[in-house]
């Protein structure tokens, strides 16, 4: 079992970068899905875009002409269950595919609540609160 404490203590990452096939489609998806979690588009040009809390990018999307690297799993912290539900609904409206609706995941931990989406490039994107 994954213990709740493990999720609160992870601070080893400064940022994550993903190659994307369509920057416009990815920006549309991440703008909609991450807004309920408090993450905003903070940087954008023809080569990429950055998202993060308070305008400090922690997720970078890089426009890439070749195949994107699909299959990554990224989990974003959410403030509450309502934000996770909105992450899922807004993400689906913006082109994401359902990969697990908002709800408890008791097999992860007794307090784990999450939703999962597949982004336009095939990555598994999660919103979670514990």
Q: Where do the protein language model's features map onto the residues?
A:
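Core segments of cupin and vicinal oxygen chelate
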Residues: 18-58
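Long, contiguous binding/interaction regions
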Residues: 40-44, 72, 82, 94, ...
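Long, continuous compositionally biased terminal/linker segments
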Residues: 52-93
């Amino acid at each position: 079992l994954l213990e709740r404490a493990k999720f609160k203590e992870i601070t080893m990452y400064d940022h994550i970068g993903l190659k994307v096939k369509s920057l416009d489609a990815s920006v549309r998806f991440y703008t909609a899905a991450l807004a309920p979690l408090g993450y905003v588009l903070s940087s954008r040009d023809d080569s990429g875009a950055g998202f993060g809390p308070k305008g400090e990018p922690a997720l970078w999307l890089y426009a890439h002409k070749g195949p994107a690297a699909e299959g990554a799993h990224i989990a974003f912290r959410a403030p509450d269950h309502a934000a996770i539900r909105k992450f899922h609904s807004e993400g689906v409206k913006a082109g994401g595919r359902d990969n697990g609706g908002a709800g408890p995941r008791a097999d992860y931990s007794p307090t784990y609540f999450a939703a999962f989406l597949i982004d336009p490039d095939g990555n598994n994107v999660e919103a979670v609160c514990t």
